[in-house]
């Protein structure tokens, strides 16, 4: 099973790239983690935010291979703790499909992305900067994988 993080935003600071890559490289070959960056729409004083969200959403959905399970990160989504995420990861593996996790931009996700999702996950009740979410996601997914394989990374 491959996991894709599809995130709005490009040209992240070096610390974001390094943090994400630190966890991405730890994933096993049979469960690679891939990052697909979607160019954010230009947000100015008179920006049409609804149109920007629509364009970003179209680009996100176009990046998802046919048949993938779509999971959105969204405030009203399910709140999974680490053991619950590990259970989700196991269920996704048993489902036999790759997983695409969508990370929206500053205004969140387009309605079309939310409508296409099979699951919605609330990463935190906190508002997190979007660059940091990439690192938190990579680490959380790696930790969940470590639980499913009894790898010593996760300690209770």
From Swiss-Prot:
Keywords: Cytoplasm, Methyltransferase, rRNA processing, S-adenosyl-L-methionine, Transferase. SUPFAM superfamilies: alpha/beta knot. GO terms for molecular function: rRNA (pseudouridine-N3-)-methyltransferase activity. It comes from the Bacteria. One of its GO terms (cellular component) is cytoplasm. It holds the Pfam family SPOUT_MTase. S-adenosyl-L-methionine binds at residues 73, 104, 123-128. It catalyses: pseudouridine(1915) in 23S rRNA + S-adenosyl-L-methionine = N(3)-methylpseudouridine(1915) in 23S rRNA + S-adenosyl-L-homocysteine + H(+). InterPro entries: Alpha/beta_knot_MTases, RlmH-like, tRNA_m1G_MTases_N. It is found in: Cytoplasm. Gene3D superfamilies: 3.40.1280.10. Homodimer. This is Ribosomal RNA large subunit methyltransferase H. It comes from Vibrio vulnificus (strain YJ016).
């Amino acid at each position: 099973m491959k996991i894709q993080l599809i995130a709005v935003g490009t040209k992240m600071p070096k610390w974001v790239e390094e943090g994400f890559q630190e966890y991405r490289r730890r994933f096993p070959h049979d469960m690679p983690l891939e990052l697909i960056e979607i160019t954010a729409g230009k947000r100015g004083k008179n920006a049409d935010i609804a149109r920007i969200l629509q364009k970003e959403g179209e680009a996100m959905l176009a990046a998802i291979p046919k048949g993938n399970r779509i999971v959105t990160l969204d405030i009203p989504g399910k709140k999974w703790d680490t053991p619950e995420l590990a259970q989700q990861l196991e269920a996704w593996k048993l489902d036999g499909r790759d997983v695409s996790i969508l990370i929206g931009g500053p205004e969140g996700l387009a309605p079309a992305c939310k409508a296409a999702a099979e699951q919605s996950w609330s990463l935190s009740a906190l508002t997190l900067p979007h660059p940091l979410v990439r690192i938190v996601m990579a680490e959380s997914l790696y930790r969940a994988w470590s639980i499913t394989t009894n790898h010593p990374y996760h300690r209770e």
